[in-house]
Amino acid sequence: MLFQRLIWCALAAALLVGSVQFAVQRWHAVPIILAAERFEDQKAAPVAAVAHEHAADAENEQHRHDAAWASAAGAERSIWTRVANVLYAFSMALLVFVVMALWAWKRGNATPALRVAVVVSAAGWLTLHLWPSLGLPAEVPGTAVAALHARQVWWLLAVVCSGSACATLGFASVRWRWLVAAALLSVPFVVGAPELEGDALAGYSGEAHASLLKLAHEFFWATNLASLSFWFTMAAVAGPLFARWLRPPLLAALDASNPASANTAEAAQ
């Protein structure tokens, strides 16, 4: 029963949060992406540092890419973007609810569900957006970047370290947990994020180069706004859902496994 409620609550949260995220993206981020895409065919030459293994077939590959997305420039592209937002929100809602349940198990149920949802969502924002983006900020289409594998490895390192730091602060009781968290947060930047050698917009010149620089700056703030709105909405939705539908069966399960927790449950109610 608890598992079924978890799935349904995550789905409800995903539909609400994913819809809000889609609206924010359509309002602020998508226009920037579409504006940047108009400059892609003005790139004079690819940057050697980011050439793929199939560079010899780059021109044919680009034609296939353009053809594949031509039909998706309108409603179809919007539909799949919304589906992707809902699926991502579903996975994040599951994660938030599980961490909230872990909080209740480890720290009791005296803390209001909405407050726990805010703390967990803030940790999710720091782990999955803020800390990785400090080294690998979002880029507009047409921007050259460092090698994909190196970026993936560093992103994963940043997520693991920041997530571990949040878990240490949230669940550890030792007094030096702040030092451990600070050390974990510093690891990705001691290693160093992969950087591109040279100008990321080296293939562009004149007006295109200046326009893409401006769009890149706007896109940086747009992605941060979208991420903040996502996690803020997640907290606002997850708190009431957890309190109404997930906390009661969770308390019952905790009481069944540990009779001593009955006092904590009564205090929370």
Describe every region a protein language model picked out.
Residues 59-91:
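Individual transmembrane alpha-helix segments
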Residues 120-122, 176-188:
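Central hydrophobic cores of alpha-helical transmembrane segments
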Residues 138-179:
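A contiguous pocket-lining binding segment that forms or flanks enzyme active sites
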